[in-house]
Amino acid sequence: MIWQFGEIGYDISINDGDRVDKKPYKAPEYLKVAERKALYDTYAMLLKFRKDNPRFFDGDVNFRWAVGSSNQKERHIYSSSADGKHYALFGNFGTGTQTISVNLPSGVSKWYQYDNGAEWNGSSHSPSMAEGQFYLLVSDRSMCLR
């Protein structure tokens, strides 16, 4: 669930007045700020992925969520659908750059970045990732935005 204006980084507390009080509408003003526009675009991309790929969110899927017990700064989500398609989402949620060890599910030789179609070969990777950086990989290039 995205709280009202959460996709643009609203600048007052959610509890300002009350959680469900009407909040000032500032989206046109906020979207002129590059960082807020980037956040909005990220939400839009992830919501488009979900809308275009119900196979991963409804019905018969395998889902694996990995959060390091000693390192809460990285997250990994892997899912596969009954029709043989896969996605992997992983990111750095720490406050600085770090190397993330990624072991993608076996059985897929090529992965593609959802946002730009860049190829990832093999299953083992250790990308250096800036704080807040994430990758959404898919097993079929036709699922990519570009």
Task: Give the location of each predicted region.
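Glycan-recognition and catalytic regions of carbohydrate-active enzymes
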Residues: 2-87
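Short conserved micro-motifs at the rims of enzyme active sites and ligand-binding pockets
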Residues: 14-16, 100-102, 139-140
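Surface-exposed beta-strand/loop patches in extracellular or lumenal glycoproteins
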Residues: 93-107
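C-terminal beta-strand-rich structural cap/linker in extracellular carbohydrate-active enzymes
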Residues: 122-146
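Conserved active-site loop/cleft motifs that coordinate metal ions or position small ligands
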Residues: 1-5, 88-91, 112-113, 138
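Short, solvent-exposed loop/turn segments at secondary-structure junctions
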Residues: 7-11, 64, 93-96, 141-144
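Hydrophobic, well-ordered secondary-structure elements that form the walls
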Residues: 46, 90-92, 111, 132
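Solvent-exposed beta-hairpin/edge-strand motifs
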Residues: 103-118
